[in-house]
Amino acid sequence: MDNEKGLLIVLSGPSGVGKGTVRKRIFEDPSTSYKYSISMTTRQMREGEVDGVDYFFKTRDAFEALIKDDQFIEYAEYVGNYYGTPVQYVKDTMDEGHDVFLEIEVEGAKQVRKKFPDALFIFLAPPSLEHLRERLVGRGTESDEKIQSRINEARKEVEMMNLYDYVVVNDEVELAKNRIQCIVEAEHLKRERVEAKYRKMILEAKK
């Protein structure tokens, strides 16, 4: 049978919820076959991050030039920094039959939903907003004012859960990883995704 087109898997949630940690755990699993779509950002690189691995880090001017050239599936400005997803890599990789894993902010996910309505949208939620605050404080990288700004934004983002297909609570990283992998596996078994291939197989068998 023909190769099935890959899924676009969109993981997003509030800043500090642990999206990057869960994503890294997924890709450390030897059974993972997803292709990671690296986002582009204008924010400062954090300790331990690598350009071209965690993000493509760009200046604001360079990022805005790419916006004008329509080179993003989505982009958003969040807490003073741009984040965006380069478009061509995602399309080409899905056409080759690979699942593409996209870790982005909630505003960006809204734009992806418009352009890729058949994508799989997963919201990574904190056990509570207080737990989220503790994670942000624990980073030790931001002022109290910036942390409060992120908490206020998180409240709005939690109210936007209805844009997503699934919600996974990140109460423990390994559990969150397993839940996401199970969701993706089940999505591949949906009738809508496999029916056309089997209809073609049946027609060919009748010839």
Curated annotation (Swiss-Prot):
HAMAP family in alphabetical order: Guanylate_kinase
Main location: cytoplasm
InterPro entries in the record: GK/Ca_channel_bsu, Guanylate_kin-like_dom, Guanylate_kinase, Guanylate_kinase_CS, P-loop_NTPase
Entry-linked PROSITE patterns: GUANYLATE_KINASE_1, GUANYLATE_KINASE_2
Organism: Staphylococcus aureus (strain COL)
Family statement: Belongs to the guanylate kinase family.
Domain Guanylate kinase-like: 6-185
NCBIfam families on file: guanyl_kin
Protein's name according to its UniProt entry: Guanylate kinase
Subcellular location: Cytoplasm
Function: Essential for recycling GMP and indirectly, cGMP.
Swiss-Prot/TrEMBL catalytic activity: GMP + ATP = GDP + ADP
GO MF terms, alphabetically ordered: ATP binding; guanylate kinase activity
First-tier enzyme category under EC: transferase
UniProt: ATP binding residues: G13, P14, S15, G16, V17, G18, K19, G20
CDD domains reported in the protein's UniProt record: GMPK
Keyword terms, alphabetized: ATP-binding, Cytoplasm, Kinase, Nucleotide-binding, Transferase
EC number: 2.7.4.8
Gene Ontology, cellular component aspect: cytosol
Pfam family, one: Guanylate_kin
